[in-house]
Amino acid sequence: MRQVTIQQADSKAEELTVLKANLHTHTTNSDGTFSPSEVIGFYADAGYDVLAFTDHRTTNRVSEYDAEGMTLLSGIELHPAGPRGIPWHILAIGIPENFSCTHPESGQQAVDAVRQAGGVAFAAHPYWCGFTAAEVMTLNGIAGIEVYNTSTRYIGKEYNMTIWDETLDAGRNYTALAVDDVHGKPDLFRGWTMICAKSRQCKDILDALRNGSFYATQGPEFHRLSFHDGIFEAEFTPCAAAVLVGRQS
């Protein structure tokens, strides 16, 4: 956990807390290999700050778990009917532990229920599911998509960059997550989301997810971002290449 300086045009620089997060986690409460306490131990030992539990169609009582210094978020993965007979995989983060809409009939019902409960909804691994960008855009109210998902790499569909790019070109300001979607040990620590929040409290983390104050990564990290007088500046850790991508570029 560290600080980063964010400065937008015509505004003062703001110091935010940077939190390393895995936002897609399965346990033995659905189809995961590890118990909640085992998963917490793995991520705490690896230096993560935030862990969201998102078991299939069921929530976890995260308030009863030993967080081992991390912030734990209550979540769920929902699977309502989708286009062409393909079930949606909707990642919900920040919902109450007693969330009741565990078997929604439609994708829109799922997203609406998540938002009404105070959570944030994302389309999980749409490329792996087989959805097009146009189909993803029928879900009104999602915050974004998983742009990288570790557990779908086995069939070469871990990256969802094309779908994300097409939705952005269509005018949807979707944000992007990188997640492990951990089911077992081979899925650990391959993609994560760096959340820039006012604090490590659940409320501030969820506000950051709603507002897009985060970035997806598999390694490189930002230290400073600035946009002033039409000039974008960034300081970050060493990487193989850095490309600034604009609209339709």
Regions found by a protein language model. Give the residues of each.
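C-terminal functional module detector
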Residues: M1-E14, V18, A170-T175, V182-S249
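A metal-dependent hydrolase metal-coordination microenvironment
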Residues: R2-V120, A124, C129-G141, E146-E166, ...
